[in-house]
Amino acid sequence: KKFNFNKPPINAKTGYIDTNILIKSKYILKAANNQNLLNILKSYFECSFKLDWVWAWWSFPSEELAGPQLFHRDYESMNFLKVFVYLSDVDEFNGPHEYVVGSHKVNKLYKRERFADQLIYKNFTKENILTIKGKKGKTFIANTYGLHRGLQPKNEKRLVLVYLFSVIPSNRSPKLPV
């Protein structure tokens, strides 16, 4: 359902921006082809890779949690990384990203489901949980097979852009060339 992101419906938790709009932006494609970024990805993958998908979404303050606001793993592909770009300032009150450091290397809690905080804290120490805050433009890379979530915004909405880079096509890959 389409709505104005400045006036979301009362029950809206998230709002996705149409990928077809994103891929037509020269700025978004230019950022994905930043040579420093590509060098980091090349070093990680040690083989050919491609930009597989790009998407962006708003997260709104809400009484209820949305699925991505619970710890989970992503299963897009066998070998992938995501590049996150905050398009709004993100502090502890408007939905910072949390990542369980080292969880991409272990198969604890590997089922395709969302996990309650208590289960995460039972299997990992609080010191393993990295909270990523930053100003608009903050960019970070994550292997999101590792347990992660975007915290629920409390005061302000959050806008994030995500690039998916993959060695093999993912379940998000376009079926036809873009």
Enumerate the predicted regions with their spans.
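Non-heme Fe(II)/2-oxoglutarate
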Residues: 5, 113-114, 139, 145-178
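Double-stranded beta-helix
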Residues: 92-147
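Short, conserved beta-strand element in jelly-roll/cupin
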Residues: 76-92, 133-134, 141, 164-168
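Non-heme Fe(II)-dependent double-stranded beta-helix
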Residues: 1-69
